[in-house]
């Protein structure tokens, strides 16, 4: 197919015909009617004398997840292509990703469909390829992506907002556009009928596109894009949202892990720690051995009980909500992308902790979850478990107002509480307006503190300027924390790669640490140390230390507010890890030789497809009264002799610390399968003592799981229970 001779035309050329189609679809009742209408529409636009042709990708653009740059009129010939115009800071763009993931799992390039992300930056920081690489990893983007830093394609097509999807036919001809989020049904309808229409005409090709996933180059690290961190003021433990590993860590102040809950893969499951899963958790708050978690991409608030070692859901239904008022009981109340949480109080008692304040980034609001019956300002008595909007209209704005429901936020992403007078407020890092705002705990009034612009609709007033009030400029701040000792507010000025400090009395905002460079430097001087998109921070050690989630450096940085030194908190397990610089390197567990007496159990074959996760649940019973030997690590190993590619990048060994709470072993089938048959083995070695400790012994067992891999989409795979009584 030859490239069109003329310049590509804008999306406005599609508007009349597609608008008529969408009005007709409103009146369609059956799926057959809808399919027919879309088919007729394609006949119409395909018959136009001149295609609405997309321009070629400009030369010299930076590509990710591909072996080489992609050409519209060479590589994409014979494909239905979905162009996703997005920017990685945008919550609406993030909301769209699950729809694209679902589409990728339904149709592959062999079926004739390809998705290409066209990154068109809002903030200057988002034009930098390294920062986009971090976003690709953080959001598990596996389709090809191009960094259109100058927004050339955006301007050629006259795209107007993020996100926008443009669906192309096999000649690079524009067929449909979808603006904003929430169009999953239309996306699937349009792409499925387009594939059928052009297959009927023999114009779809099944050639594969050269994919090379950037995530395969990621080095091992104890943390992966940690989003938030908080301190248990009673024990000085830290709670870390290890966002990229989809888990919550509870660590002692020396960095030793006490609990690891969830991970390494995303999921949505309550229960005991070894079985519970999260999906890109962000905000965390801890009090009395209870942790509340903003489970962002699950659209849930989760509760972790450290004493019972269980996880439960207290708000949200597991899918993105659109309700902007709320008022239902937590588990029945849909919510949208909660990004941070902080404890508050409904009465005059300071720090009673009967309210959980929520930065609801997805609906641009501040919500409240009642942990006990109580009252909010200007509200009647509310029952325990009620989850509702407190401030924000739901419009994406930088609007301050004495009436909380008339105020507007723009993706609030960080919260901190100053309950004492004269402050008595929530501090809010309002990321998309590049401001810090306050919400009064007495009447809900929303006020400006620093950053941004007076025009409530101007969300482009960002920069890196120390100053007072509106003269100070921030760039997409994601975190705030209140220093009660000094009456100062610390701000994670994320896209400026700095930590700033604000005096709320004078509204003076100055740089505390960071140079603005994204190098990973620790120093005896705050001003010489560097950060890379820090996402969260908290005060610890009675106001002496500031802990920073240095997100893109995959670290927790420790800032000593007295000595002005910056260091890295090592994250390690007590005996099974050593620290080598910023990365944790697990001591390589060596698979012991199985004793001849060890039973070998061959399981029934399991069928799975690429991308699915197979779970093995250990269910081993010791003789009555026996207990695991203290000081000796009972352990498990995952092997795949002759098919080691199955285990690449997976956790292939681990400890068994408690016989009453045995781990679940996860194996995700890689997207690129080198064989359709394999045998996966689980070897278990248990060291235990009899009830009276008169005899201690080691027992082992081998489970062999035949695996058949298919390219046909499978339903949910039931966990495989590995049972044996010793």
UniProtKB/Swiss-Prot annotation:
Pfam families found in the cross-reference section: NHL (PF01436), Thioredoxin_8 (PF13905)
Subcellular location, principal: cytoplasm
Keyword ATP-binding: no
Compartment(s): Cytoplasm, Cytosol
Tissues in which the UniProt entry reports expression: Ubiquitous. Detected in heart, kidney, muscle, brain, lung, liver and in skin fibroblasts (at protein level).
Residues covered by the Thioredoxin domain: 43-200
Stored InterPro entries: 6-blade_b-propeller_TolB-like, NHL2_NHL_rpt_dom, NHL_repeat, Thioredoxin-like_fold, Thioredoxin-like_sf, Thioredoxin_domain
Keyword Cytoplasm: yes
Keywords assigned by UniProt, alphabetized: Cytoplasm, Disease variant, Neurodegeneration, Repeat
Disulfide bonds listed in the record: none
Coiled-coil stretches noted in the UniProt entry, renumbered to this chain: none
NHL repeats, residue ranges: 212-254, 265-307, 335-369, 409-439, 461-505, 518-562
Domain of life: Eukaryota
Effect of residue 148 to Y: In FINCA; uncertain significance; decreases protein stability
GO cellular component labels: cytosol; extracellular region; platelet alpha granule lumen
Self-association and partners: Monomer.
Listed PANTHER family: NHL REPEAT-CONTAINING PROTEIN 2
Disease: Fibrosis, neurodegeneration, and cerebral angiomatosis: An autosomal recessive, early-onset and fatal disorder clinically characterized by progressive cerebropulmonary symptoms, malabsorption, progressive growth failure, recurrent infections, chronic hemolytic anemia and transient liver dysfunction. Death occurs in the first years of life due to respiratory failure.
Functional note: Required for normal embryonic development.
Protein name, entry field: NHL repeat-containing protein 2
Species annotation: Homo sapiens
Gene name, Swiss-Prot/TrEMBL: NHLRC2
